[in-house]
Amino acid sequence: MSLKEFTLDWRGETLRGELRTYPHIGNPVIQLYDEEGMPYTTASINLPYSLPEGLIVIRTSENNSLLVALETAGIVERTGQTIPVGYACAHLCRVLI
């Protein structure tokens, strides 16, 4: 997957987003940066196995509103499946960009 950039409005901030792949297994990662270019948050979780093409795991244990913002912006959509991650569950989503 090549680098894809986007902007995301979340919690009153305009963030620059990058969709790329984790280096080890190649699963997609969404990293968000603030207006100064500093890392803001990572929206995804890397699992120890490869995901099917076009899918990403979005963590919501701390920030469910982040998933809503990503959906509203047309970046991802929920598949309806969740994946246990530690003591929480994360949402399996389709990448739309």
Predicted features, each with a name:
Residues 2-42, 50-53:
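Catalytic phosphate/metal-binding cores of nucleic-acid and nucleotide-processing enzymes, i.e., regions
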Residues 59-97:
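Short, compact, well-ordered microdomains
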